Design a protein with these regions (language model features):
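A residue-level marker of the well-folded mature domains of exported/periplasmic proteins
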Residues: 1-286
């Protein structure tokens, strides 16, 4: 599968198949033009649930869900206000706050960078949380921000990360899909740190990727399928955040020995304060 979120969703799908005994089928559309076609084709099969991954499906699903009121749908990363649609969203700003704390405390230059894919409201959540976390941990830090305009242009990601590094950023966080692989490549080639996103990307450059802001699309997919099996599906919006393990940091598999315990403790402290409500991370979508 070409997309990080799709790959994570597939894990959740296979988990549901194994543990819940459901039959599953899936397709990864080649382009936006195919999305409505696939949604309608699956609805025509009379499936118990049709799940679409990503905000780019939203406009098509508004139309399709209205045309198939007897079919249950779910969408990841956007909201469709329809009685037969369950919207699965994440508190990406909260998870990004945690990796921002890490970056703010680990930076030796007091400059860190953020590279986004498309400049859309969803990716603003990552940017906002990261900047707030970095400045919470280190009020003197400066956050450099650039958008690539694409989720599939590693060359542009590499170019922007190198530019930020040349301007002083020694840690760069990406929320850029496939474009982000260029950010990680640039970090390896130029000797600065990167922070991955969505899945655990630490393996892509052990010791260079400090951590990843993990977003458990697999968990969301599994849970919505389970609710169908259990007969508890209610539609509406379901949000996954730090408290329920929907977002968070990766396990620092390759970097735990490089990161001071005081920094790891600060991340845990921030996590606890977000859960308790003592820290409220800004959500640009609200």
């Amino acid at each position: 599968l070409r997309d990080i979120a799709n790959s994570s969703a597939y894990v959740g799908l296979m988990d549901a198949k194994e543990k819940l005994g459901v039959e599953v089928i899936y397709v990864e559309p080649a382009d936006i033009a195919e999305m409505e076609e696939h949604q309608r084709a699956y609805a025509d099969l009379g499936l118990d649930l049709v799940i679409v991954i990503g905000f780019i499906h939203q406009s098509a699903l508004v139309e399709v869900s209205a045309d198939y009121p007897h079919i249950n749908f779910a969408i990841v990363d956007d909201v469709v206000d329809s009685p037969n649609v369950t919207s699965l969203v994440f508190e990406e700003h909260e998870g990004s706050f945690l990796v921002g704390v890490l970056a703010g405390l680990m930076s030796e230059t007091n400059k860190v960078g953020f590279v986004g894919g498309m400049e859309v409201p969803l990716i603003r959540k990552f940017e906002t949380g990261f900047a707030e976390g970095a400045k919470y941990a280190n009020p003197d830090v400066e956050v450099l921000v650039n958008y690539a305009g694409s989720f599939g242009d590693p060359g542009r990601g590499r170019e922007l990360a190198v530019s930020q590094n040349e301007r002083g950023a020694d840690i760069v966080y990406h929320a850029a899909g496939g474009t982000g692989s260029g950010v990680i490549d640039a970090a390896v080639a130029n000797g600065f740190y990167a922070i991955g996103v969505d899945s655990d990307q630490d393996y892509m450059a052990p010791g260079t990727v400090l951590t990843s802001m993990v977003k458990r699309v697999d968990l969301a997919v599994y849970e919505v399928i389970k609710s169908v099996v259990d007969g508890t599906l209610e539609g509406g919006v379901r949000s996954f955040g730090i408290e329920d393990g929907g977002v968070g940091t990766s396990e620092f598999t390759h970097t735990k020995d490089m990161i001071p315990q005081s920094v790891l403790d600060a991340i845990e402290d921030a996590k606890a304060k977000i859960i308790s409500g003592e820290i409220v991370v800004s959500n640009p979508l609200q």
